[in-house]
Amino acid sequence: MNTLLVGINVAVMLILVGVLYYMQRKHVSFNKRVFTALGIGIIFGLILQFIYEPTSKVIIESNTWFGLIGSGYVKLLQMIVMPLILVSIISAFTKLQLTKNLGKISGLIIGILILTTGIAAAVGIAASAGFDVSATGLQQGDAESARLKLVEERFTSIEKTTIPDKLLELLPTNPFLDLTGARPTSTISVVIFAAFIGIAFIGVKRKYPEQAELFKKMLDAVYAIVMRMVTLILRLTPYGVLALMAKTVAGSDINAILKLGNFVLASYVALIVMFVIHLLLIALSGLNPIQYLKKVFPVLTFAFTSRSSAGAMPLNIEAQKEKLGISEGIANFAASFGVSIGQNGCAGIYPAMLAMMVAPTVGIDPLQPQFILTLIAVVAISSFGVAGVGGGATFAALIVLSTMNLPIGIVALVISVEPLIDMGRTALNVSGSMTAGLISSKWLGELDQDTYNQDDTKTGEIAS
């Protein structure tokens, strides 16, 4: 019986995929197809929630099949991330876009990311205090116990790593290993490796212009192929969003969400407030925040459904260049740094809120100015090297809680609402990286104002 029901659910999913394909054949815009996929996915997931239990075998098996589309799409995006970073950053050097301002660009982007992470921590602290979020009364079930065991194992490895060691991990000892994304800091390491190649190219160009020109032509060909691959993968976005949203909604435990409703509500209020702060920073830079919102919404939608900052990188870079008018070099640096440094959601709001929740259980008044200022500083500094894939928020929370000498068990006790909150956190992470790129590009005079101010209908569509 279960097999039949699973088959029906999968058949419905395939029909919905067919609807999106029909819309594509009718040349419905990319943005409209993404929004349609988001809405249909939520409705389909809610229907499955209503008919079955979230923990039922039918839902679990159906979600496994849905994962062929949703998770498969995310994996394709992750496949292209490292080649895209490597080729794009080297290409920026060969086109002389980063020669003069490399240090200024890197410093400004990282500075904005760290600053906004500190602000995000303050917002998380305010939300926790405003909603009186507390760890008191949280119950530990089987799922929480299993998660706690994993958390403690991970904490043991983190505890042994000193701050100098963490900084050394950013350097690429084996760039080919980092191209596989094997380490949490692989993205930053690839950026550094690509920058070294770019700097070496500039030196070779002065002494051996013929060899440099040959390298540039080869790189241009590789760059064209990689960007074509990106375009092909991004065309699948509506299908990926549909499957990811349906899977997430269908598998969410409503009862568990209601039990931690105050924490979920406080988290999303903090996320929304921080997103508004992004818009304010853009406005203060002399740009129209409404234009930004309209142009990046499809990217944020995908980040929300996929829960992967790294997976959203190709969309992120494409939107910065084609929609916002950000120069290629800055777009690549901002997206790359934003995956591992200064994530406003995962490394800013989330660790700060957990620290505020657990502090009273060990006799600390979380509203003491000294505690708050220390927490903000620790969160900002600890935001280096947080992986842009699932689990990055846990990694950041463990670092912050251990540095503040607070119990780490709280990380396991909120597992039931982790997927729901992680969706909003990831969208904020991606918005933070694009905001950093946009503001940096504006301040350095690298922004194409005409592209930024154009209506969406006049600019080239993502994945067109």
From Swiss-Prot:
GO CC terms of this entry: plasma membrane
A single GO molecular function term of this UniProt record: symporter activity
A Pfam family annotated for this UniProt entry: SDF
Role according to the record: Mediates uptake of L-cystine, the oxidized form of L-cysteine.
Source species of the chain: Bacillus anthracis
Annotated PANTHER family: L-CYSTINE TRANSPORTER TCYP, PROTON/GLUTAMATE-ASPARTATE SYMPORTER
Location(s) in or outside the cell: Membrane
Protein name: L-cystine uptake protein TcyP
SUPFAM superfamilies (UniProt xref): Proton glutamate symport protein (SSF118215)
Membrane topology of the entry: Multi-pass membrane protein
Family the UniProt entry places it in: Belongs to the dicarboxylate/amino acid:cation symporter (DAACS) (TC 2.A.23) family.
Major location category of this protein: membrane
InterPro entries (alphabetical): Na-dicarboxylate_symporter, Na:dicarbo_symporter_sf
Membrane-spanning residues: 3-23, 34-54, 73-93, 107-127, 184-204, 225-245, 263-283, 347-367, 371-391, 395-415
Alphabetical keyword list: Amino-acid transport, Membrane, Transmembrane, Transmembrane helix, Transport
